[in-house]
């Protein structure tokens, strides 16, 4: 009986194969994996924000990216961005219902510490982006942004339970109709757990703390936000996967505003949905 149980347990464990960790945390928090040398993929990656202090607010940004892994230590992505807006009755924002091509983004990821001798793996990600419309309001602007991330993870239970954490620095500069360049920056840190509940399906939770500043060098603090929510990853086939997250601002504050939460620099809720198609 004991040998039968041990054999059954071994079969169960064998069903849980090794996973690439890049997208298992829902993609707000990103894992360290860079894929297999020579891999190519197409990735529609949508980020959406919902809810301001009052009125109706929804805005999304979809990056249509080509991903290529020239070596096991380096990965590149690039492609156009499409944005959509549905804004009505939000103080400080003009009403808008529209969709438009909104720029171009690229990303370079490089492994700093490979998993092996070290229990942790760490990857550096740099993502420059150009936008022709403001990501919050949709008005025409000239915007340049650089998202810099340290992406780290470790395996707590082999092939089953994973811990990920990110550090974020995101400076940007924007020129609107007045012709004046305005600088701002967002910094943050995250922690995420992901559990492979059945083979190729991972559920988890993601926690982010974000701070916003006027000026690129932490000039004037304007507000902060804590986001928390569930994540889902599904390896649909050997060539296709899905990664999703939905997070709510559970704490935060805006400088000079009494109500809780920062709903000027951040949204009440945010979501992310990515599909990957290898070829």
Task: Give each language-model segment a name.
Residues 10-279:
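Transmembrane beta-barrel domains of Gram-negative outer membranes and organellar outer membranes
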């Amino acid at each position: 009986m004991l040998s039968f149980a041990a054999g059954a347990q071994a079969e169960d464990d064998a069903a849980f194969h090794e996973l690439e960790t890049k997208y298992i945390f829902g993609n707000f928090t990103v894992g360290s994996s860079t894929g297999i040398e020579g891999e190519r993929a197409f990735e529609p990656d949508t980020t959406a924000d919902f809810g301001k202090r009052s009125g109706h607010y929804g805005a999304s940004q979809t990056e249509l990216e080509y991903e290529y892994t020239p070596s096991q230590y380096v990965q590149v992505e690039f492609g156009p961005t499409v944005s959509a807006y549905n804004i009505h009755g939000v103080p400080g924002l003009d009403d808008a219902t529209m969709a438009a091509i909104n720029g171009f983004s690229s990303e370079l990821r490089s492994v700093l510490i490979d998993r092996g001798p070290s229990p942790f793996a760490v990857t550096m990600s740099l993502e420059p982006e150009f936008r022709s419309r403001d990501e919050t309001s949709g008005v025409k602007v000239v915007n340049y942004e650089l998202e810099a991330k340290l992406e780290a993870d470790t395996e707590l239970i082999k092939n089953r339970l994973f811990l990920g954490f990110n550090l974020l620095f995101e400076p940007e500069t924007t020129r609107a109709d007045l012709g004046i360049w305005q600088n701002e920056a967002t910094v943050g840190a995250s922690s995420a757990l992901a559990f492979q509940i059945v083979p190729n399906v991972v559920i988890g939770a993601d926690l982010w703390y974000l701070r916003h500043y006027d000026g690129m060098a932490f000039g004037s603090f304007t507000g902060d936000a804590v986001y928390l929510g569930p994540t889902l990853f599904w390896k649909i086939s050997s060539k296709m996967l899905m990664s999703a997250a939905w997070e709510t601002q559970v704490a935060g504050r805006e400088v000079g505003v009494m109500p809780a939460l920062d709903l000027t620099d951040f949204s009440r809720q945010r979501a992310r949905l990515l599909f990957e198609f290898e070829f």
